Amino acid sequence: MSESEGGKDTTPEPSPANGAGPGPEWGLCPGPPAVEGESSGASGLGTPKRRNQHSKHKTVAVASAQRSPRALFCLTLANPLRRSCISIVEWKPFDILILLTIFANCVALGVYIPFPEDDSNTANHNLEQVEYVFLVIFTVETVLKIVAYGLVLHPSAYIRNGWNLLDFIIVVVGLFSVLLEQGPGRPGDAPHTGGKPGGFDVKALRAFRVLRPLRLVSGVPSLHIVLNSIMKALVPLLHIALLVLFVIIIYAIIGLELFLGRMHKTCYFLGSDMEAEEDPSPCASSGSGRACTLNQTECRGRWPGPNGGITNFDNFFFAMLTVFQCVTMEGWTDVLYWMQDAMGYELPWVYFVSLVIFGSFFVLNLVLGVLSGEFSKEREKAKARGDFQKQREKQQMEEDLRGYLDWITQAEELDMEDPSADDNLGSMAEEGRAGHRPQLAELTNRRRGRLRWFSHSTRSTHSTSSHASLPASDTGSMTETQGDEDEEEGALASCTRCLNKIMKTRVCRRLRRANRVLRARCRRAVKSNACYWAVLLLVFLNTLTIASEHHGQPVWLTQIQEYANKVLLCLFTVEMLLKLYGLGPSAYVSSFFNRFDCFVVCGGILETTLVEVGAMQPLGISVLRCVRLLRIFKVTRHWASLSNLVASLLNSMKSIASLLLLLFLFIIIFSLLGMQLFGGKFNFDQTHTKRSTFDTFPQALLTVFQILTGEDWNVVMYDGIMAYGGPFFPGMLVCIYFIILFICGNYILLNVFLAIAVDNLASGDAGTAKDKGGEKSNEKDLPQENEGLVPGVEKEEEEGARREGADMEEEEEEEEEEEEEEEEEGAGGVELLQEVVPKEKVVPIPEGSAFFCLSQTNPLRKGCHTLIHHHVFTNLILVFIILSSVSLAAEDPIRAHSFRNHILGYFDYAFTSIFTVEILLKMTVFGAFLHRGSFCRSWFNMLDLLVVSVSLISFGIHSSAISVVKILRVLRVLRPLRAINRAKGLKHVVQCVFVAIRTIGNIMIVTTLLQFMFACIGVQLFKGKFYTCTDEAKHTPQECKGSFLVYPDGDVSRPLVRERLWVNSDFNFDNVLSAMMALFTVSTFEGWPALLYKAIDAYAEDHGPIYNYRVEISVFFIVYIIIIAFFMMNIFVGFVIITFRAQGEQEYQNCELDKNQRQCVEYALKAQPLRRYIPKNPHQYRVWATVNSAAFEYLMFLLILLNTVALAMQHYEQTAPFNYAMDILNMVFTGLFTIEMVLKIIAFKPKHYFTDAWNTFDALIVVGSIVDIAVTEVNNGGHLGESSEDSSRISITFFRLFRVMRLVKLLSKGEGIRTLLWTFIKSFQALPYVALLIAMIFFIYAVIGMQMFGKVALQDGTQINRNNNFQTFPQAVLLLFRCATGEAWQEIMLASLPGNRCDPESDFGPGEEFTCGSNFAIAYFISFFMLCAFLIINLFVAVIMDNFDYLTRDWSILGPHHLDEFKRIWSEYDPGAKGRIKHLDVVALLRRIQPPLGFGKLCPHRVACKRLVAMNMPLNSDGTVTFNATLFALVRTSLKIKTEGNLEQANQELRIVIKKIWKRMKQKLLDEVIPPPDEEEVTVGKFYATFLIQDYFRKFRRRKEKGLLGNDAAPSTSSALQAGLRSLQDLGPEMRQALTCDTEEEEEEGQEGVEEEDEKDLETNKATMVSQPSARRGSGISVSLPVGDRLPDSLSFGPSDDDRGTPTSSQPSVPQAGSNTHRRGSGALIFTIPEEGNSQPKGTKGQNKQDEDEEVPDRLSYLDEQAGTPPCSVLLPPHRAQRYMDGHLVPRRRLLPPTPAGRKPSFTIQCLQRQGSCEDLPIPGTYHRGRNSGPNRAQGSWATPPQRGRLLYAPLLLVEEGAAGEGYLGRSSGPLRTFTCLHVPGTHSDPSHGKRGSADSLVEAVLISEGLGLFARDPRFVALAKQEIADACRLTLDEMDNAASDLLAQGTSSLYSDEESILSRFDEEDLGDEMACVHAL
């Protein structure tokens, strides 16, 4: 219920919903309304309840405010019908009723049993009648709501709400189905088979009614988080969905090309249509596929294909379905094996393995990345919201309390008139009036005190004491209650008196004391460590007794277990009673473990008594015995890290509970839908019953849950398709249901589990880290610190435990630190792998002698040292390691004595001797093991030594019979591990994995304990019950004898005889170990449905299964899967991911840039501009323009899409004309793409064409396609007689792929996809070492597998067969890859166990035929699965989540993936990749790049200029900026890297940081991106700041003028002057705001208006430039400066006659009185920057040449001949055509005055940022002044902020030499003053400034008072302002001076203090040139 944000007024208007206003009790005074059912006597305690009521009323009121005035065009709000509807709809019970109806409806749908063939029964018929009732209720609800809210037009109308719309559709569909049912029935229908009208199944639509429970979601806040994060993630998930779809489409089309029609041949008996095999698979009539080996069989076509013809590549849709199935990693190996049978081994494995790696490992892991990112974001938001809510509730309580107290006081005042009022009330009222209001806490405490009814004494004291202070109403209510209780109290009092007397006797006192002592002792005993360990020992014994149970155990063991159970139960009961007595009930109950103990003990007692009495079987509750095992978790008390983990698990339980609710709703909805679609339809195969069906509601739930876990979901889908008539049109649509269910359930919901786990662990991890820090710093405070964490009961022991834990942890940490010091600097995780691996440091010879005889200086030792560190030596050893590994893989596992093995044996001798020599050399250098730094002190060296010694020993023992030798031979496999020590990056990954394993330890313990507990429960439930007879008709071992007949496929003509055997299930629960094994396979989701159905059918020990005997037992498996597989395994995975992340972030800890900043800066430093070729030749240029045009791009895009469609149209058995058409189309497309290639080659010339990777790719495809056509034509022409398949084999398989590859070009088009691809490639760069580690693990396991299981015979029908075996190295690797994807790995494990048939070619002895395989298989496969599934695959996930965090990050944060765009667009401005562009183009460039990097198209030009002010890129002497500097400045400002504080200092710090991270960085590049302080030149930022200030001045001039010119002439000069000064004062804040670059608050003028005014400005005011004296003229290069508002093209900057005629003053700063010269801004300012080393006067010749190169359009020169201004060019931007297509506007350029020759221009700038401003981007810091500025000048002085609370941007100063002589660069005599109070300086006589009047002083004073002191110090500015005021007031300057003197004489001077002159000559000079950019005003 959301409270309305605002008002404190908690008394709403009465609304139709609550009906009542203030009740009668509150009649006396205004107050809170009475709520129904609440008595008038309620006190302040009622506030929370009442507050909720208020909030409800508020919402209702708000809602009514938003209601549509009319509903259905006729019902107004006053209409009684509508009012009654509204009150019904908003009545709470109505909501509850509807929800109950929804539940009832779900139940009805669930109870309904669908029958095959639309059959039915009475129950179903009755349920269909009930449907009508539901329909009526829902229809009524809908109608009422429509009447109440209106239908659709108003925003708050009924259908506008999503949930309502859903309801509406469901109701309409329901009514529609009823109408259809009433239609004429089909002949022959039974009267009660409803639901199938007109042949259309409306029940399927009815099932949508089941979506209604989703309305519950709005009631549970934690569900909101889950749903919100899923909803939020949908947008990035859509991107990924597109990528997945793209992968699927490409693979589907490749599949069509390669595998079209390959699945339709199988082995038939000669001359008949009978399939030769029971389980047929494809074959090949020729080539390298599977041949039919049985006699009388042949390979031929017309077989529908595997899975009834559903799995194939016969057309595009089948291909997509098959590819999707492979991407989900279910059943992909079957498809692969069928393809290998049909085609041979060359191509299929490449196709399928690459598909699984890309589609599953990479793309689908992105889903996880996105979800976990979104989830953590959402959780943070929710947390923030929660905190805010609590804060608000607290405020609300206080407010309510205040309201109540005021109201009580008022009531008392009214009561005062009543003489009979109690004295207490009077005093209370006084207290209230005196302001002694009780606080909320006080009131609640008193209330609590009064409720202690069991303590009479406390009550009496409270009743007396509280009367004085409680509010009157409270006291009233108390007296009432006391009145009621008086009678009882009489009796109570007498009892109490008796009791008191008895208690005071001596005996009782002694007893009490004894009791107290005994309790204290008990408490101490219970809390002692001895007791703790004793209990743990008991738990351990209990565990042992339970774990020792197994099937077929001897009688004595059973008896022992029974006795042990009873004894242990007694002991646990004693412990419980002792605790209860010692601690007291309340303290006992407060601990969670105690409550749990109590529950278990009571359960045990109950179970034992029931069994003894014989009331029940000794089974059901014996499960409770197993629950006792949970007591093991008591260990956590002494194990800090484990208890942290358990805490964080319990923490995530909360989030997971809400997720489970969502999951449950999801499963119910899909189960009901499944029942409607498939109920009773899975009976198409009569020969065997399907178990995963939708025939009843529980069964449907199980099936949906199975699909959710992804196990064999494809099999259920095949059944669904076959139920609807097989792989033809309508039946195939069924797959949509399964695909949606699988995607939503498995990918989204189950990944949210993992996301929650990762998120909670990450936050828990942070907590633990903090705790560790805390523990280290204040161990003394441990007791106090931990009091809050522990229940009061167990404080002392907890403290002890924690102290110990802390000490242990400290020791561990110290050890870790030592280890880390030994390792080379920091184990960087996944991230570091990208870094260039630095050269290994040469380890010096350690001190001490080697072999006791070679000293440190021994020449032999030195020589060896040089040798082993020589790079040739190390590389050679690496090569030998690789070669020896290859030789291992090449061995023949079957025939040990084959020729190949002999040769490899000799190689082995060679390698071993080389490695032995290496080790001896190293021992010579480092010594063996006695001293520090010696050879054997390193783990990796020990590994080397082990591997070599194993090889040496195995040479010594020759007899291969000894199993030791076999083991030693297997150990040679560890050789590749020696490479780890050689490759630095690999070492990092391995260290990372070890850290992960160490961290995972705790989780392993918790998971194993839980697994063990479930295994014990499983043993109790299922031991000995999984036995079956091979003949299903027999149920006991006694019956199961002899043989029986089998009819395959129900064919009576072919009976087979089989023997009856009594067999156990492969996975069973006969003992705890088997149970753990079985449960482990369940937790990997492999084969668990089979186990589940066995458990459901299990009946009793030594009795066969009974179909669906106990369906409820499935709860055991579901709970196990949720707790272990969903939750614990995901936490496991989450931990790995977090560990890798933490390892990766370690390297960012020491430097000041975070990961994202670092990546962006690295990109900016390393990026190079792209070259863009622009041809000179006009014809070539035309082609180039065409090829580069957008239209051409779109045309090619369209062609590729059409090509894709054409490729996708192929299908199996297509007609000859269709074939011909496809060939023609292929040629057409190839021709078109060839033309594209030729055009591009003409446009770019081959050299430039092939530099772009995409072009090279295109060329390859075109050439391949042409070859493809040629080969096809030749084949078809030459071999018409032959079968086309084999002749065109080469072309079909290989060259056809080129057609498909064109699709990949689409990827280069879309923006989002491009970014995804970019990140993919980044991930791949981060993966090489991870991939290397995976390859090593695969290699080692493959070689071990070959040695151990290579001899097992290949038998069809088993898991070790022709497609899946260990006989060759590639086969072994493929088999392991299959296990890594989890495809039935447990079956391969079973097939490798001992007792399997040996391969006939292997060398086994007589009688050893069935001895192949090994028990080692269990350890082998489980360890491999754990390593792969949990560690290795998660390395992928970790890397991907690392690189894709931008998908979920706030898009407005700049990331490295944004920066490619900059390169692309820069190349348009700098086609030659010179790395520099005109600084004017920077604005245009940045407006073309979208935020966050650029400004975006919508950014106004002037705002863009403002943002450039913050960029500190150096401006070169030719007016250009460089590529890296621009990109770096963008990154720096966007990510706020060192932008605060003093800029010089920040720059210095940043330079240090960059040097520290990128040690090999070139100094030149560093100086380019961060100019060093001593060379600071003009930067773009300063340049644009100059322009902005000048522009502001012009604007404010115009505004002021508008304001002042309207007035009539002032009556007196003095008052006119005062008005002028006042207006100047008004202007102050505006000026300050302008200077803070505050764009937001500026008043917006219409752009058109501004332009018109500009036009008028130029036409009416013939003002010219103020010329500088000729001494200032020098060589210069003109740089144009953009202005925000633009001029029409028609306006020329050319000089007019009037301009030429206007005389200009030789005095630069004092305007002529009365002249119009300085009235308004003229056309341009000149700002020239000298070219270095070029002092001759120069025009724009060089510039023009460069401009021509850049193809700059027209230019206008603006010459003022008389004034002698140097020529200056106004440049229009080269991209004008692109940028201003719509408007006829070009930016007006302003140019600044020239700088004298021979010196660099240098700005002095001070920028003071306004506080609290985030949107402004000021340039911080004090900038460097020119080289000539004095060393003693106080640089920081201007930084003193003005006292107005708002800082200002000081304008920029262009310091120049020239006419004013040395004055402008003179030394400052003292620090510059900021403004203080208003004071007028004395007259200042300065020869260079002519006469100054009193008016100047007044203007200065006003400026200073307004915080514009910096302007006041500039005499030219003051003169200008004075001139402005004079013009505005229509005074001459002399009149103005006189008026000023009069004002001062009249005593205004008392306002000013005359202490000292503000303008000293030096200050003035320093500030004088401020107007360099503004003096044209």
From Swiss-Prot:
Residues 48-59 have a biased composition (Basic residues). Residues 1-60, 418-441, 455-488, 767-830, 1637-1754, 1816-1841 are annotated as: Disordered. InterPro entries: CAC1F_C, GPHH_dom, Ion_trans_dom, VDCC_a1su_IQ, VDCC_alpha-1_subunit, VDCC_L_a1su, VDCCAlpha1, Volt_channel_dom_sf. It holds the Pfam family Ion_trans. GO terms for molecular function: high voltage-gated calcium channel activity; metal ion binding; voltage-gated calcium channel activity. III repeats lie at residues 858-1140. Residues 455-469 have a biased composition (Low complexity). Voltage-dependent calcium channels are multisubunit complexes, consisting of alpha-1, alpha-2, beta and delta subunits in a 1:1:1:1 ratio. The channel activity is directed by the pore-forming and voltage-sensitive alpha-1 subunit. In many cases, this subunit is sufficient to generate voltage-sensitive calcium channel activity. The auxiliary subunits beta and alpha-2/delta linked by a disulfide bridge regulate the channel activity. Interacts (via IQ domain) with CABP4; in a calcium independent manner. It is linked to Night blindness, congenital stationary, 2A: A non-progressive retinal disorder characterized by impaired night vision, often associated with nystagmus and myopia. IV repeats lie at residues 1177-1444. Residues 1-92, 150-161, 221-239, 373-529, 584-591, 640-658, 759-871, 927-938, 984-1002, 1134-1190, 1245-1251, 1311-1329, 1442-1977 are cytoplasmic. One of its GO terms (biological process) is visual perception. II repeats lie at residues 515-761. I repeats lie at residues 79-375. Each of the four internal repeats contains five hydrophobic transmembrane segments (S1, S2, S3, S5, S6) and one positively charged transmembrane segment (S4). S4 segments probably represent the voltage-sensor and are characterized by a series of positively charged amino acids at every third position. Ca(2+) binds at residues 330, 711, 1086. It is found in: Membrane. GO terms for cellular component: membrane; perikaryon; photoreceptor outer segment; voltage-gated calcium channel complex. This is Voltage-dependent L-type calcium channel subunit alpha-1F. It is a multi-pass membrane protein. The gene is CACNA1F. The chain crosses the membrane at residues 93-111, 130-149, 162-180, 202-220, 240-259, 348-372, 530-549, 565-583, 592-610, 621-639, 659-679, 734-758, 872-890, 907-926, 939-957, 964-983, 1003-1022, 1113-1133, 1191-1209, 1225-1244, 1252-1273, 1291-1310, 1330-1349, 1417-1441. Residues 112-129, 181-201, 260-347, 550-564, 611-620, 680-733, 891-906, 958-963, 1023-1112, 1210-1224, 1274-1290, 1350-1416 are extracellular. Belongs to the calcium channel alpha-1 subunit (TC 1.A.1.11) family. CACNA1F subfamily. Residues 395-412 are annotated as: Binding to the beta subunit. Changing residue 519 to Q: In CSNB2A; likely benign. Glycans are attached at residue 295.
